[in-house]
C-alpha cells in the first residue's frame, strides 16, 4: 500500500526533544494547516487541521535547534496510527505523521548558520534513526530524475511559440502577514 503525506504548516508549539535509550533523538512537533473554500451561500470558510509529527535522529536535533512556535515547515512522511490506555483505563487514539524529511519554509534569516542549514536540508533525507524494519531510501530521490531521458526542450523553443494561456493567469500577491497562523 502507498502511505505518503506531504504537509505544509506552522508549528503550534516549540519542539519537544527527547533521547531514546539507544541514544537516538526523537522529537514531537504540532502542526497547524488550513484550507480556504467557498461555502454554498457564497461566503468564504476556513478549515483548520491540527496534527502531531514525529521526527527522529539528526532531523529531530536540527528541528529543536532552528524551529520554534510559529515556524513554517514542509514535512514529508507517512501517516501512523497510535492507540493507548490512559490512567483511567479509557482507550485513546490519534493519527500522527512519522517524518521522513523536513524543510524550512520561512524566509531566510540574518543568521548565516541557519541559512546554510536550511539550504542543506532542502534535498537531504535525515531518516537515519528509524527502526530497522523501516526500509529508508538509500539515495537522494532528486538524483533519480537524471536517469530518465530528457526531451529536446530549450528556452528558445518555449519563447518561439507563445502560449495562448500566457496572459490569462492572474498574478496573486499574498502578504505573509495575512496568513492566520
Curated annotation (Swiss-Prot):
Molecular function GO labels: single-stranded DNA binding
SSB domain mapped to chain residues: 1-106
The UniProt record lists the keyword DNA-binding: yes
Compositional bias segments (type: Polar residues): 111-170
Coiled coil spans: none
Keyword DNA repair part of the UniProt annotation: yes
Region (Disordered): 107-181
Pfam families the UniProt entry points to: SSB
Motif (Important for interaction with partner proteins): 176-181
One example of a Gene Ontology biological process annotation: DNA replication
GO CC terms in record: nucleoid
InterPro entries reported in the protein's UniProt record: NA-bd_OB-fold, Primosome_PriB/ssb, ssDNA-bd
Keywords per UniProt: DNA damage, DNA recombination, DNA repair, DNA replication, DNA-binding
Function description: Plays an important role in DNA replication, recombination and repair. Binds to ssDNA and to an array of partner proteins to recruit them to their sites of action during DNA metabolism.
NCBIfam families listed in its UniProt record: PRK08486.1, ssb
Oligomer and partners: Homotetramer.
The protein's name: Single-stranded DNA-binding protein
